[in-house]
Amino acid sequence: MMRRQHAAPLVGAVNVLMVVLAFVASANAQCVPGGIFNCPPSPAPPSPAPPSPAPPSPAPPSPAPPSPGPPSPAPPSPPSPAPPSPAPPSPAPPSPAPPSPAPPSPAPPSPAPPSPAPPSPPSPAPPSPSPPAPPSPSPPSPAPPLPPSPAPPSPSPPVPPSPSPPVPPSPAPPSPTPPSPSPPVPPSPAPPSPAPPVPPSPAPPSPAPPVPPSPAPPSPPSPAPPSPPSPAPPSPSPPAPPSPVPPSPAPPSPAPPSPKPPAPPPPPSPPPPPPPRPPFPANTPMPPSPPSPPPSPAPPTPPTPPSPSPPSPVPPSPAPVPPSPAPPSPAPSPPPSPAPPTPSPSPSPSPSPSPSPSPSPSPSPSPSPIPSPSPKPSPSPVAVKLVWADDAIAFDDLNGTSTRPGSASRMVGEPDIAGTKCKGNLKGWMPKPSRNPRWGQAVFSGGRTVGSVANVTIRVAFATEKPALIYSSIELVVYNTGATLIRVPIAANVTRSQIRCPGFLTYGTTPIAGYPTGIDATTWPNWKIAGVRINMGAGNKKPKTSIDAVGLNLK
């Protein structure tokens, strides 16, 4: 008998221990990771859950461990000791929150039976439940959440505190830890309560209400023991005020400086007037100069825009909605951007055109000798000088770019004839093949008097072997003041055999039958050679030859 009496308490303790283990096992079974209810780590439940109030369904699971607390979010953290045994609380709240409260209702009953048994043996355990003992406080704590819905009280019933008593013995040490997480949780709900636009926070409470209906009966058995923790949440609530992000608007204040766009200063710089178009001298080609200005403006524009761009980054920092108004202020900054373009025509472009003219002068030197030799011929009639044309006008098609007669282009010459034999071709021009008769004409920028011209040198770029007949005739274009232009042939039926390789062909001023005899000062006084005309032979279906340069040999 004595043994039995001594064994009785031991057996009772063993039974209690078995019940607790069974309950824990069941909780673990429900809380298997990847199962219906996941066991969040102790730190995870408080902080992550509140931040994601938007999805109501996820929110309830996180509070599930804290569900022992009456306020759906706040008290939960105190019970977070449950992490070891959060399973019991989690089943009730989560299940009702997502799909249907009905399944959870059966779940609470199952924990209920164990709860009565544990209370009697773990009389020592009550110390942990003792804090929850004051049920009355629990209603007050729900009071703040009341605006969301009376649901908070209902969570208190589901508070399977009955399971919690057994849990406290083992996780008693953790219990202190939960309080620390709890403060974070309340802050999140707290901002909602004060802030009118806290619709998100109400959303989580709304899921909570479903829980109360089913577990309403269980609520009486457990007199809202977790209420004591609830008072703790109120204390954290003060920290909540700091949570309001209004301080973030401070960044916007810097944003106003961004509107300061000093872009207006750029506009003052008046766009420099475009450089006066130089007169069209015989030796200076106009086309090159105009193209140069456009490229120069492009570079200036990129540097200026970067300055306005920095302000735009500032608005991004004030991600909060309040700053959004600030961005409009930066928007005005774009108007200044047009101002930068104005500087673009700054003097910088003007220099750019200057280089383009510089090349033109370089060729001019070649013509410059022209005037000097012209006076010399009289004293030394034997001397022969080669004069190259600076500009050429093709009345048909020049370099394949002309659409109608009269187009102008620069004609390039070489000072040394010997060095050009059978070596690369110069940029030349050729008549359109569709012309009938097909012809091309090069006109010198300045005419030479007939008396000073010994012969004509033409550089031909030979591009095809057939047909044998390349040029039907080569003519000098001669004009006299007050008279119409006339053409005097100086060669006829020029064939490939005469050209040999692309090079220079020189023709004298010997007259041809049917034309004026002799082109000289005695025959045609005051007449000048204006240019050279080449007529393509009738047998050339697709002429591929071109005149690269034409020059006059002075006497």
UniProtKB/Swiss-Prot annotation:
Domain of life: Eukaryota
Keyword Signal found: yes
Region of interest (Disordered), residue spans: 41-382, 397-439
Residue stretches of biased makeup (Pro residues): 41-380
Protein's job: Major component of the outer cell wall W6 (crystalline) layer.
PANTHER family cross-referenced by the UniProt entry: KERATINOCYTE PROLINE-RICH PROTEIN, KERATINOCYTE PROLINE-RICH PROTEIN-RELATED
Region ranges (49 X 5 AA approximate repeats of P-P-S-P-X): 40-339
Post-translational modification: N-glycosylated and O-glycosylated.
Keywords from the named record: Glycoprotein, Repeat, Signal
Tagged with keyword Signal: yes
Name of this protein: Vegetative cell wall protein gp1
Residues annotated as glycosylated: N399, N455, N493
Record's signal peptide: 1-29
Subunit structure: Associates with GP2 and GP3.
Chain coiled-coil ranges: none
Organism from which the protein derives: Chlamydomonas reinhardtii (Chlamydomonas smithii)
